[in-house]
Amino acid sequence: TEGLILLNHGVFSFGNTARLAYSRMINLVDTAEQYLVNHNAWDVERSLNKVPTKSMHIAVAQLRKGISLVVGSPVLLNITNSERGIDFSNRSDVAEIATRGPVTPDHVIRTKRIPMIGRDVEKFEQEYISYFKTNEPNAKERKTMLDAAPRVILDKEFGLCAVGKNMSEIGIISDLYEHTIECIHRAEKMGGWQVL
């Protein structure tokens, strides 16, 4: 056995040495990448959407304040200004595909389960609390709800935004969600985005 592919999750490679396992990983990833290219799912087309402007400062400050109140302490809000984030935020189906869940369960540690679509912080907070109250009783061990504020925002005007206590945290969240966007785009081209 050279490797293992877990549906909707990832690739694992094996070998008697680290070098052999790594070589097999490269071969498996190259094969997968070529498959995506051959099925027109590698290159993601993007439209040219306008990046955020300075006139949005008040709206950004109000949004950051609303999120800070839910967190219970001041947070930073960063508009990534990435073409990928703006384009994805302006998809007609963004509310449906972006809220199916994370690429991998461990992303929720940084990004929360789903992004906030638009700027309705109160709605996101209520839905987060409701989700927790519905699902916590089913957990094997008791869970403590963290703050109900978003960490990722997808907004038609702002594009992709990340929320965190410092720029290091925001950078990690932004990177994770930029990767998530690429995964969703490619999966949609291959028959539909699904989470584990």
Enumerate the language-model features and the residues they cover:
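Active-site histidine-anchored catalytic micro-motif
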Residues: 1-3
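Short acidic/polar capping segments at secondary-structure boundaries
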Residues: 10-12, 17-20
